[in-house]
Structures are given as structure tokens and as C-alpha cells.
Curated annotation (Swiss-Prot):
Its main location: periplasm. One of its GO terms (cellular component) is outer membrane-bounded periplasmic space. One of its GO terms (molecular function) is metal ion binding. The calcium-binding site is structurally similar to that of EF-hand proteins, but is in two parts, with the last calcium ligand provided by Glu-228. This is D-galactose/methyl-galactoside binding periplasmic protein MglB. GO terms for biological process: chemotaxis. It is found in: Periplasm. Belongs to the bacterial solute-binding protein 2 family. The gene is mglB. It comes from Citrobacter freundii.
Amino acid sequence: MNKKVLTLSAVMASMLFGAAAHAADTRIGVTIYKYDDNFMSVVRKAIEKDAKAAPDVQLLMNDSQNDQSKQNDQIDVLLAKGVKALAINLVDPAAAGTVIEKARGQNVPIVFFNKEPSRKALDSYDKAYYVGTDSKESGIIQGDLIAKHWAANPNWDLNKDGKIQFVLLKGEPGHPDAEARTTYVIKELNDKGIKTEQLQLDTAMWDTAQAKDKMDAWMSGPNANKIEVVIANNDAMAMGAVEALKAHNKTSVPVFGVDALPEALALVKSGAMAGTVLNDANNQAKATFDLAKNLADGKGAADGTNWKIENKIVRVPYVGVDKDNLAEFTNK
């Protein structure tokens, strides 16, 4: 009787191992540069939601905690676990070459997302792709929004000099999105014939608390009453600026962000923010998951999808959001 029990146990264990092995055939390793980034939190949850609709896929999720060395170690572990594809949100875009060499060693395809690797890095591996946005587009659209509202609100021009006196909260220095948004928002305004004067510019590293501190310092400085527009590279920093302005009883100063986070959309609705730019987290997540799953299954990256791949890159478009079209992006 004991032998029969042991034999049955062995068979069941074998079946369970087989099921686990089968599940491992569609394992996809994912790293997020840090879980507590507002925007990447939305992307992460959207990827997890997409994966739930594909029961044959098992995601192995990792929080890299803004540490590239930690992320490299996580990738080593994922490869050791036999993942069939990697979806990597780099901590440092300059580390793409190192990550690619790890993946190449196991012949594992890789989809980078949100933080764009260099062209050289992407071209170095035939199984490397990128999902993201055209960084300069977000700056251009933000500039268009500011120009639209500047024209509609002549009272914003506090000193009546026809020039926008602005402060700008910048994201991570060197990050492609931060650099492009900072450059192109002002370029677009100037291209439209609007003169600008920078009163302050500093990094707040995409972070609400840091942005609040920066804005608070500016509102306590000599230019406090000259600020006509606040420009932020993302909504998290815009929200920090809103908090600081409220504390200084300056809620009439318009604030513009990027991402169209739910919290920011609520601020646009209330008037605390003048506008934002939709950084389409759901479609970036879906494209990342679709490409990674196809590659894990040995298919072409875009097979059976509507994604357009150009030079190994999927670009998800941005959309400007203000009160005029807010309803399109809420209650979904």
C-alpha cells in the first residue's frame, strides 16, 4: 500500500513538474526601472493586465529600484530561469549594450520600452526591439497647448510684455524624454512667434516631492511674482508644482505637464492644471507585451498585431489634453 502511495505521489509530482515546465515555455522576464515612478506604475499594471488575458504566459516581474547594477543582476537571474523573451525598462539607457550581450548569450529576444537605447545598441542584435514614443513630439504638443492657452488668456501676461516668463521642471538629466521635452516645448513656442524668457530651470528627477521643493524655493525667491507659466516634463512634477503654488496662494499660475495620469486629468478638470499630454501607457504596455509574446513564441515581432515597426521601433503617438477634449480621456 505504501509503495502504491509513493508511486502515485511520484506520478503527481511528475505531472506538476511537467505543468510547471510547460508554463515556463512562455515565461517572459520584465524589469521596471522603479516601481514607484508614477507613469511606469501605470505601464506595469497595464502589462500585467495584458498578460492575464494570455493564460499561456507567465510574467516574471522585477523592480530595479533605480539601480542599473541591480537590474543587470535581475536579468542574469531571469535568463537562468529560462525566460523566452525579455521586456526591459532600462534604468540607464547607456547600459543597453551590456543588457543585449547578456540576452545574446542565451539567444533570447529583448524588447526595450520607455527608455530608448541608442541606435547602435539596437542594431547590434537582430532580436532587439524598442517600444516608446517620439520624445520631441511630446515637447511640440506641449508647446502647442501652451500657445493655444496663452492666446486665449491675455491676463496670463502679467507684465504685458508679450513674452512668456516661465519656469521649467526637468526630468532626469540625459534622459531622452527630458532633454527633448525641454528643448522642443520652447522651440515650438518660439516657432509660433511667441517670445519666451526662462526665469528658472532645474531638475526634479520626475518626482512630485522634489518638484514641490523646487517650486517652493522659486516661489520664495526674487522671481516669484514674475512667473507666468510653469512647464513640467511630466505630470508627477506638475503635481508637485501645483501643491507648491497652492501653498503660496498662487493657484492662478498655469501649469502644464506630460503623461495624462489620472491624477493630472482630475487637476485639469478642476482647473489646477491647464493641460497635459497623453503619454499612452496602455498602448505602450500592449505593444511591449505583444512584441515580447510573439518573440517568445518564435514568431515575427509584429505578427497578428496592428503595430507598425520601423527600424525595429514601435512609436506610440502623443495627444494634447485640456478641458476642451478631457472627456475623451476620462471615465474609460
